[in-house]
Amino acid sequence: MAATRIQPSTREIFTTLEYGPVPESHACALAWLDTHNRLLGHYVNGMWLKPEHRNPAPCQDPITGENLASCLQAEAEDISAAVEAARITFKTWSQLPGTARGQHLTRLAKVIQKHQRLLWTLESLVTGRAVREVRDGDIPLAQQLLHYHALQAHAQDSALADWEPLGVIGLILPTSFSFLDMMWRVCPALAMGCTVVALVPPSFPTPLLLAQLAGELGSFPGILNVVCGPVSLGPVLASQPGVQKVAFCGAVEEGRALRQTLAGRGATLGLALGTESLLLLTDSADVDSAVEGVVDAVWSDRSLGGLRLLIQESVWDEAMKRLQARMAQIRSGKGLDGAVDMGARGAAARDLAQSFVDEAQSQGGQVFQAGDMPSNSPFFSPTLVSGLPPAAPCAQAEVPWPVVMASPFRTVKEALALANGTPRGGSASVWSERLGQALELGYGLQVGTVWINAHGLRDPAVPTGGCKESGSSWHGGPDGLYEYLQLLGTPYRESFLCESLNYDTFGLAVSSSLPSGPETGPSPAPPYGLFVRGRFQSPGTQSSRPIKDSSGKVSSYVAEGGAKDIRGAVEAAHQAAPGWGAQSPRARASLLWALAAALERRKQVLAAQLERHGAAPTVAETEVELSVRRLQTWATRVQDQGQTLQVTGLRGPVLRLREPLGVLAVVCPDEWPMLAFVSLLAPALAHGNAVVLVPSGSCPLLALEACQDIAALFPAGLVNVVTGDRDHLTRCLALHQDVQAMWYFGSAQGSQFVEWASAGNLKPVWVNRDFPRAWDVEVQGSEQELSLHAARTKALWLPMGD
């Protein structure tokens, strides 16, 4: 009796041309786990730590459910030990010449190349991602990151001579992010002289392997320390003494909670939130190429999240038909199968996608899925949702992997309104064969990265980040380096947490000015009004507050602004912002020059005003002269705020754009009332922002005097100055959801409140934590730090080829 033939014959294979399995062996990954007896701990200071009495968490194959190993979950003392090791190593690592650090990173890149099979096998095995994406994408890019940042370290001593490393960096990664996301943040931190403590999920041991490879280089084992534990331990890591910055990747609500928890603790916070991306398909696009772009964006295991797809109505039917046909060809299977397009992400990701699809159907959406999957399957079919009303909750919610939510649009203006109408601003691609239309959409999208006729391109030299609720931190390119640097001489960031600060009542108890007796001198001048919408006007409270001179006598009155006045000022700024942002650099520069000339003509009056408030004559004259010079400095720099070309390893240029933040709130310090006001106003205007300012509390008259010239030169509503109780106005601005960024220079309690309140719309904030700033020193008053905070970066990719 003939044996039963299981495998197809060669003729059948060439007739059907069906895919067959191309399995990769996971023997090397299992062998590495066996060397640890299938029990992993933490990697700290070049050693494996397996403390007793720790709860183990399983590390499972997300497809088969097989228990591959167990990983001990960290507790507070484990994190403290890792931070201490990083802090001690920082003292020597940061003092090394940049050349030596660059050589160390190059050696690490060679070690990764040597052990790349182990890395991509382990990563694919434990995450379920398609092995070809990890092997052909993640590992080569990780090596490129190390080589690029090694070169940046070589140039640090000359190109970044005025900057110094921050210190110990805390990195928090959730389960949905890969080891490559860790590399994007670890490489610039190490290159600039920082050391890293990473908190990673216990179910993903690849970061532990990476730390082991770095530790085995021998010279500086404590530069990269990895502890395993849930995201809930993030506040424990962030609050450790010595941690100067926390980089967090994860969900929006987790980032919002961490922002509030870290308020007042001294460490800066860099957020990269959400995973959704956007794709705009116009009627002039190559539809087949755009469909492949959708596959790359969400169904190729390159992306971590879902996709919001906007299709022009004239090609809606054709695009949807071709997309559904392409979905039927996508192969799901084990990640270690080389012929698989899409693997599995585990039960949590599958349940989240199913919940979103069920909710979308209940709200009127139409669902198309390529193939049926059993309810107990670890895989989730590629899913296309359409027909949702624009007001449906799912139409505004973040789209999870592997779901595409499609919506039609008619015009470019409508496409921008739909695309920018969500609180997320991560990445997007524009598909159009008309370059002018593509650039118009690319410039108009409120996101951090835009690809033209491509999706998901990455290069170490190109900055990647986001805006709005996607976070405001950057990695890659020069922007990623500044995330881990501070100006020379910046005070050490210690915790300034005020435990007694009541967030519910801060700024609500407005101090009242009681009569102090009969006036014996000449009557003070009539009170200044609030400067809103280009003119002085009475405050909503119809009250004023006294301003005293150096002798303690009342010299004048200013308006007592409140919440109603802040609302009006922010509304006026929003109306003026689009027009000012669209102005050419030459037009903005000419107005800044004109303001400098106007203040110079009135320098004697302004200096006399400063003298009445206690400034020595020479100091007052110097402050006015520096203010004029500061305006002139930023007027000359306006031309440098445009786009620059970035060289990458791919064919085609990348435009690095510097875009306005929008409406910027600024609370000025009490010291240097004229110079600080101008030093903060000038870069904000130079970069195209509209501004709402609270001037010096002790001497606001100089700012109001300058507003007389601002009213004659600048568009109405572009600059708004509100006087009153600083804490109360700070509260109103920090809690305002339409303020898109905020700078605060005041008390430690005010800095803490601003950081806490910014979690509402996750606006980027810059606070001084009660440390005085030398505004008369050029480096602190007009240098690159102000420019970095005054605008956001957008990378616009223009790849070439068919």
Swiss-Prot record:
Molecular function (Gene Ontology), one example: aldehyde dehydrogenase (NAD+) activity
SUPFAM superfamilies referenced in this protein's UniProt entry, alphabetically: ALDH-like (SSF53720)
Superkingdom, taxonomy of origin: Eukaryota
Region named Disordered: 513-554
Subunit structure comment from the entry: Interacts with SPG21.
Family according to the record: Belongs to the aldehyde dehydrogenase family.
Name the record gives this protein: Aldehyde dehydrogenase family 16 member A1
Originating organism: Rattus norvegicus
Gene: Aldh16a1
